[in-house]
Amino acid sequence: MTVPTPRHGTPHGGLPGRTVLITGATSGIGRAAALAIARQGARVVLVGRDPERLRTVTNEVARTAGPAPDAFRADFAELRQVRELGERLRDRYPRIDVMAGNAGGMFWSRTTTQDGFEATLQVNHLAGFLLARLLRERLAGGRLILTSSDAYTQGRIDPDDLNGDRHRYSAGQAYGTSKQANIMTATEAARRWPDVLTVSYHPGEVRTRIGRGTVASTYFRFNPFLRSAAKGADTLVWLAAAPAEELTTGGYYSDRRLSPVSGPTADAGLAAKLWEASAAAVGDTAR
């Protein structure tokens, strides 16, 4: 599907003066993207969970690109905080040109949030899905960019069992399922929201803080063969700034190239069912 005529945030490329919202902005890909996008002249809006790291990145962006960015604290493991965040953002910004849904994590043992959802699914998919829907009117004519991963091939999406209660827990599979959900959400959003250019992307294997507090964190933080956060953020930054006519709404990108998806992830009917199940899960009846 090619993009329709609305502006989509940056019709001719570039970001000067645009409002760019980045979740998961306090470390890794989100931090790197915030710095790069601010350097292009955008008004960056940061969202993060940890107040100290949020202050640190706010100061880094200010030193790099001038005025301090706006910053909002929210823990995506609590949907109440996501709803409150949505209200604050709607009150503050009449338009959001780009929303980069980048918040994420991996939980090595099964964890249930106070909302009753498996934590990986909620933090990586449901919370961002809810926030995008809350900001739907502000995103009109803009872009929605969802961080995914080629780990989606390990996912097992079941709209009738979002929590995966029917299967033994696997951290890798839960992570893959959440990333699979983001690709499918982008596909379905492109169908339902034709005035929003919606894409997902694979950042590559990146050195990040994911898995902190576990043995695996050593792999993700210090493996010299993994990409830097800046390299991982490159496709996100490009998707935010590229001319709209160069992009395909609903597409999945890797290294600035459109990449085909396979298996159930490519099933449009399943994507529609996932959308409805996710909306029911977060208690949001808006279309």
Curated annotation (Swiss-Prot):
Family note: Belongs to the short-chain dehydrogenases/reductases (SDR) family.
Residues the entry annotates as binding NADP(+): G24, A25, T26, S27, G28, I29, G30
Organism whose genome encodes this protein: Streptomyces sp. (strain C5)
Keywords, comma-separated and alphabetical: NAD, NADP, Oxidoreductase
Top-level class of the enzyme under EC nomenclature: oxidoreductase
Gene3D superfamilies assigned to the protein according to its UniProt record, in alphabetical order: NAD(P)-binding Rossmann-like Domain
Function in brief: Could reduce the 13-carbonyl of daunorubicin to produce (13S)-13-dihydrodaunorubicin. Could also be able to reduce the 13-carbonyl of doxorubicin.
Protein name: Putative daunorubicin C-13 ketoreductase DnrU
Keyword Membrane: no
Source taxon at top rank: Bacteria
Enzyme Commission number, as recorded: 1.1.1.-
MF terms in GO: oxidoreductase activity, acting on the CH-OH group of donors, NAD or NADP as acceptor
SS bond list: none
Annotated binding of substrate, by residue: S149
Pfam families for the chain: adh_short
Active site, UniProt feature: Y175
